[in-house]
């Protein structure tokens, strides 16, 4: 009985500690977002972060080595979730994508993606803004947007060494990053289904066609 009670006490202690860690990281994340928006990441100090999060420096250094480590850890969390959503794309053929386009139905994984972007809107607005991390936009472009474009290309072009194919992919990947940026910068007014349709429509619109959804 004593062993059981001791085990339960240890579990409760661990759970309480886990909750404290989650609470501390959430507070630091909120502080980081606010400070990137107000003074820019380069000007932020660990003292600024601790003061804004109402935490002591010891708590900060229990989890992160410096402010860059803090930022990258949150960026990595976002990129890992995006990668999971992106993996759904591998299950789709070009024929599947075209069928959604013809029926004017949004691709489900794109809807989930924009749902996640909305959920992370405050962080994305800060980190992709002028006071954020200019490297993050490049990561998003290279790891997600490029893969998205490659995924909807006909199979024979996906590994084509022709330089023009590389320029084509680079052009559309950068354009898609611009779409995401514009949506976030303008307050994410469109819902996720509409944004998924916009993303699909932009890829297949032809020269001379009306610029309408």
Question: What is the predicted function of each stretch?
Answer:
Residues 2-39:
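Basic, helix-initiating cap at the start of DNA-binding domains
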Residues 3-5, 163-185, 193-205:
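Hydrophobic alpha-helical segments that form the core
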Residues 20, 90, 124, 154, ...:
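Terminal, non-globular segments
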Residues 35-69:
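Helix-turn-helix
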Residues 45-46, 74-89:
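Short, basic, alpha-helical segments at the C-terminal edge of helix-turn-helix-like DNA-binding modules
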Residues 87-119:
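Hydrophobic alpha-helical connector segments
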Residues 111-138:
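Amphipathic alpha-helical segments used for helix-helix packing
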Residues 131-156, 166-174, 208:
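Amphipathic alpha-helical packing segments from all-alpha helical-bundle domains
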């Amino acid at each position: 009985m004593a062993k059981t009670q001791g085990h339960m006490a240890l579990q409760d202690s661990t759970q309480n500690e886990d909750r404290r860690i989650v609470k501390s990281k959430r507070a630091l994340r909120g502080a980081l977002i606010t400070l990137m928006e107000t003074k820019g990441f380069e000007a932020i100090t660990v003292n600024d972060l601790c003061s804004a999060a109402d935490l002591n420096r010891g708590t900060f250094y229990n989890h992160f080595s410096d402010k860059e480590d803090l930022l990258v850890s949150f960026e990595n969390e976002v990129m890992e979730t995006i990668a999971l959503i992106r993996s759904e794309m591998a299950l789709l053929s070009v024929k599947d994508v075209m069928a959604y386009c013809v029926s004017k139905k949004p691709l489900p994984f794109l809807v989930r993606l924009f749902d996640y972007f909305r959920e992370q809107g405050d962080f994305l607005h800060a980190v992709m803004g002028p006071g954020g991390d200019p490297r993050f936009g490049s990561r998003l472009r290279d790891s997600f947007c490029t893969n998205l474009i490659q995924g909807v290309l006909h199979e024979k072009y996906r590994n084509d060494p022709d330089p023009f194919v590389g320029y084509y992919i680079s052009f559309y990947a950068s354009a898609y990053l611009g779409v995401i940026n514009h949506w976030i910068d303008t307050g994410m007014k469109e819902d996720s289904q509409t944004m998924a349709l916009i993303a699909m429509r932009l890829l297949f619109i032809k020269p001379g066609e009306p610029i309408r959804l």
